Design a protein with these regions (language model features):
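Juxtamembrane transmembrane-helix termini in multi-pass membrane transport proteins
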Residues: 2-78, 137-155
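Selected transmembrane alpha-helices and immediately adjacent juxtamembrane segments
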Residues: 2-3, 116-137
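Selective transmembrane alpha-helices of multi-pass membrane proteins
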Residues: 73-103, 161-172, 176, 183-217
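Alpha-helical transmembrane segments and their membrane-interface junctions
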Residues: 132-144, 206-215
Length: 217
């Protein structure tokens, strides 16, 4: 029988995972902002949709792979959550110290079709399989993959990841579009540092609580 509390737990964990995966301004994030500024908000948003679809593909691949080692996961949940927190902390530090402005490339003056903007973002994101390690860390940290999960619960979890990712892209394109006259290269740099700082803060708390034997999430 499906428990409401279980569904709610899956929903919020999946949503947070989707946001964390999408938020750092890597090549696709910068591309999304560029297209929002140069072509319009919805061109930026479909760029985010393309990135989200690729992320979901990697999330499914990661979850499927981890499903074969349930016994190992259950027996070593402490170490896996510790690993997940450390990996997220490293990811946050990298994001904080990186300069996304270096990823800026000239954008074609031609808007192109929505599908073209979607598929190019999908391809760029798909070309970075290292995101699997981020999903492993997140799934371990949030205990997202567990034994005996119903199909409905699994589908709900991955849909929540997609919703979190899409919410981020919808929000960032809305924000950039609203402040387009004031948004510059320094704005991109500052936004990325804020994101990195938040990820470091959350992962730091997770690391401390794990070492204390408590559950932060």
């Amino acid at each position: 029988m499906i428990q409401i509390e279980t569904i709610f737990d899956i929903l919020w964990k999946g949503f947070i995972i989707g946001v964390i995966v999408s938020a750092p301004l890597g090549p696709v994030g910068v591309l999304c902002i560029q297209r929002t500024l140069n072509k319009g908000r919805w061109y930026g948003f479909v760029t985010g949709i393309g990135a989200s679809l690729s992320d979901i593909a990697y999330a499914l691949l990661t979850g499927y792979g981890m499903s074969f080692v349930f016994d190992y996961v259950n027996k070593n949940i402490f170490y896996l959550q510790l690993f997940g927190s450390i990996l997220l902390l490293i990811f946050g530090i990298y994001t904080f110290r990186s300069n996304p402005v270096q990823s800026i490339r000239p954008v074609s003056t031609s808007k192109g079709s929505y599908f073209h903007n979607f598929i190019t973002a999908f391809a760029v994101t798909l070309s970075n399989p290292l995101i699997i390690f981020l999903f492993v860390g997140l799934f371990a940290r949030f205990a997202f993959v567990s034994e005996g999960v119903l199909v409905f619960e699994a589908v709900t979890g991955y849909l929540a990841i997609a919703l979190g990712a899409l919410t981020w892209w919808f929000g960032i394109t809305f924000f950039v579009n609203k402040v387009r006259t004031q948004f510059n290269l320094r704005g991109i740099w500052m936004l990325n540092r804020i994101i990195g700082g938040i990820v470091m803060l959350v992962s730091g708390f997770g690391l401390v609580f794990t070492l204390m034997g408590e559950s932060l999430y």
